[in-house]
Regions:
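PAS-associated C-terminal cap
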Residues: 1-10, 116-128
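Short hydrophobic secondary-structure edge segments in sensory/regulatory modules of signaling proteins
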Residues: 22-24
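Beta-strand residues that line the small-molecule/cofactor-binding core
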Residues: 83, 93-97, 110
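Short loop/turn elements at sensory-signaling interfaces that couple input to output
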Residues: 98-114
Length: 128
């Protein structure tokens, strides 16, 4: 199933109103193109700040794993999940689980990332 196109109003509303943090990124330019309120709040950035923050700044400690994972998602085109840490605006690291899905918009590859904060799960389940 193809992902809806960027600019599709129902897709935009679904992402914006999701309770889970959601991001649309350009994997080739290391840019966050869009983020919903939950995504901004999780990382502590305003919407405008986040759109000017490189993806590599959010994942500095695991950049090689992140790039390899993005390559896999782009190659397979299907969703996949990975556990990575995200660096917040204030510099703390947050354990997360990300589900990434590739789609095309205006002839360019994009990634939709749905992210779960795993820190609360860790407190309840130290084995995770």
């Amino acid at each position: 199933m193809d992902m809806p196109r960027e600019g599709d109003r129902s897709f935009e509303q679904l992402v914006e109103h999701s309770l889970e943090p959601a991001y649309v990124i350009d994997p080739l330019d290391d840019r966050i193109l869009e983020a919903n309120r939950a995504g901004c709040a999780m990382l502590g950035y305003t919407h405008e700040e986040l759109l000017t923050t490189p993806v590599s700044q959010i994942h500095p400690a695991e950049l090689p794993q992140m790039r390899e994972f993005l390559d896999q998602v782009l190659r397979d085109g299907q969703g996949s999940t990975i556990k990575l840490t995200c660096r917040t605006k204030i510099g703390t690291f947050l354990p997360t689980e990300m589900s990434l899905h590739a789609f095309e918009s205006d002839g360019r590859l994009r990634i939709l990332g749905l992210v779960q904060d795993r820190s609360e799960h860790r407190q309840r389940d130290p084995e995770d």
